[in-house]
Design a protein with these regions (language model features):
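Basic/hydrophobic alpha-helical interface regions
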Residues: 1-222, 237-238
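Negatively charged
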Residues: 236-247
Length: 247
């Protein structure tokens, strides 16, 4: 089916808002296809942009990525969005969506998840990250030994990585920090290369996230762990160049 067809179907559903609740609208096959088509168009657009600037991305590689991509819409309120590099799952009922007071804004937020996850598909090096995590899980620095690993504290950390009881939570923490930094990187890249409506969609989602964020101290008062509170500040800084202080 053409992109025009799915856009028309979405408009028909949107115009019947009173008769079609969000639970039906955002998980309908028409909406899923609209979202998947938009995701594939993004990949095509960015690949074309990079080729124009001399990057070696073949049309065969572009087609492979586009044809492999699938999108799934989920109603689980605990799910925001995620991707494995090929498939995108988007939560349509999480708090970053439901906090918004109109269907149009909720639509923009959901599509903001699509923009974010496509950015991961385009700019995150999944094979390298997998290798890094697998080596670290075995207590091995990869792809190279850190510069300060030979110093006293570095040598002690390297030794402790051989202890599975220490290594497992260390890898989990390292992965969480890496993902926060990666989120900042991929959002900057996609906004640079694919502006327009996609930027508006991503901004809608980001504004909700900022508005719901609190300071390190406020998170501790809510009984969050110190690491969770710290990670939230890292994410805010990586994505938006801000932190929430307690002043």
């Amino acid at each position: 089916m053409s992109k025009t067809y799915w856009s028309q179907r979405i408009e028909e559903l949107a115009n019947s808002e009173k008769a079609v609740p969000d639970a039906v609208f955002f998980t309908s096959e028409a909406y899923r296809n609209y979202t998947e088509t938009a995701a594939k168009d993004m990949i095509t657009g960015v690949c074309g942009y990079l080729r124009r600037y001399g990057y070696s991305i073949s049309e065969m590689e572009e087609d492979r990525r586009v044809n492999a991509l699938t999108v799934e819409m989920l109603r689980n309120p605990e799910i925001t969005a995620y991707t494995d590099g090929y498939n995108i799952c988007i939560g349509t009922n999480n708090s970053l969506v439901t906090l918004l007071d109109s269907r149009e804004l909720r639509h923009y937020a959901i599509q903001g998840f699509r923009v974010h996850e496509v950015a991961h598909i385009l700019f995150t090096d999944f094979p390298t990250l997998k290798n890094w995590a697998e080596h670290l899980s075995q207590g091995i620095w990869w792809p190279k030994i850190p510069d300060r690993a030979s110093e006293k504290d570095g040598a002690e950390l390297t030794k402790r990585l051989k202890n599975p009881g220490f290594c497992k939570p260390f890898v989990s923490i390292a992965h969480s920090i890496e993902n926060a930094l990666e989120d900042g990187f991929i959002e900057r890249e996609i906004q640079e290369m694919y502006g327009g409506l996609a930027t508006t969609e991503l901004a809608t989602l980001d504004e909700v996230q900022i508005s719901e964020s609190v300071s390190f101290g406020e998170m501790l008062k809510k009984k969050c762990s110190p690491f969770e509170a710290m990670l939230n500040q890292i994410l805010l800084y990586a994505k938006y160049d801000i932190t929430m202080d307690d002043g």
